[in-house]
């Protein structure tokens, strides 16, 4: 079944099925202390994560927008800007969605055999799932690497504390709430876009790189 209406209906069922009772703290932290970007420990860490070209991350993601609200387990596999996969799977059922980026564009498929492809990844993501999240930037945001032209802050833990970044005319902010103690990789991240009223809360349980 590759009928678009059927696929969107099944996708809606998937999104509904992964709604959870857990609450999402969507407010940015306040009164946070930061240190200078020239901090030597931060600069060493930045060089380390810049060398991580391909990686995997597993955890849980929560998303809120004016039209969608869901929580899901996720698996993220990133090779390069033209090759990455985001797998979303339900917390309470067998429903699964695959979002795959490839040379010719993006393909979104589910465990029922439905799929849809398009050259414009942004529009496909909006049409099928209702998300307007720049996945091409998420690859760097997830591992705590600020963009070259981003306005960012370094926390007292000598790791990325927060950043502000403009994408397609709107502003995204990120707050890195906690890090894993064993590898200094992000654990809890809060992403917000006030102009589009989107909130993305990510908890990374496992890093592979």
Map each language-model feature to its residues.
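Bacterial N-terminal signal peptides that target proteins for export
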Residues: 2-11
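C-terminal motif of bacterial Sec signal peptides marking the signal peptidase cleavage site
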Residues: 18-21
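Bacterial signal peptide processing site
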Residues: 23-26
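A short, Trp-centered hydrophobic/proline-enriched beta-strand micro-motif
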Residues: 45-67
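Beta-strand-dominated lipid-handling architectures at cellular/organellar boundaries
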Residues: 58, 69-71, 77, 82, ...
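An acidic-aromatic
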Residues: 83-131
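Flexible, processing/modification-adjacent segments and terminal tails
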Residues: 111-166, 170
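Gly/Pro-enriched, hydrophobic low-complexity segments
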Residues: 144-209
